A protein has these predicted regions:
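Conserved structural scaffold segments of CAZyme catalytic domains across common CAZy folds
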Residues: 1-101
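Aromatic- and carboxylate-enriched substrate-binding clefts and catalytic-loop regions
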Residues: 73-174
Length: 174
């Protein structure tokens, strides 16, 4: 078992990468508000889904060398239907600029249905804003349509230099 971590069989058997340029991919750690339900204590602002809370997380990430902050469910008005209607408590352009100054990237949570509906437009729009990736959730099945979605989402996200965290997805067993 101790040799499992050193096993290079996947690299030896996998097809070569289809991506020519991977220089934009920056793996890293993530600060994530979902674990504590935005419940920050001892601050001089009302914690919740708002700029002040996310700026607090960005500051924390910057101080501790954490590369990303995820804005989990709640940043958009209706995440099942539309990823372009942001709640009024969040100014995403301001947050993205603030995070950039602190050398922290932002990743947005997105429900599968809303992301799949217009993923090309979603990826283009948020990439241009400076977002670094998406955490896509609630795929919850493993049929061919869903497998195809994963490939399509990865391809389109890569086109716009966005990383993807497939969350709530099937186990890739082959």
């Amino acid at each position: 078992d101790k040799e499992l971590a050193d096993n290079d069989m996947v690299y030896k058997l996998a097809a070569p990468s289809r991506m020519k340029d991977i220089s934009w991919i920056r793996p890293g750690k993530v600060a994530w508000e979902w674990w504590n339900h935005w419940g920050i204590k001892g601050v001089d602002f009302e914690a919740g889904i708002n700029n002040e809370t996310y700026m607090h997380y960005i500051d924390f990430a910057s101080r501790h060398g954490i590369e990303y902050v995820i804005l989990d469910e709640g940043w958009a008005v209706n995440l099942k239907a539309d990823l372009f209607q942001i709640v009024p408590e969040i100014d995403l352009k301001k947050l993205t600029a603030y995070a950039r100054q602190k050398n922290v990237g932002l990743i947005l949570w997105a429900g599968y249905h809303a992301f799949a509906r217009d993923m090309e437009h979603v990826c283009k729009h948020y990439s241009e804003m400076g977002i670094k990736g998406f955490k896509i959730d609630f795929m919850d099945r493993d049929d061919q349509e869903m497998v195809d979605f994963h490939y399509r989402a990865a391809e389109i996200a890569a086109k716009y230099k966005l990383m993807v965290d497939f969350h709530g997805t099937y186990k890739p067993t082959g």
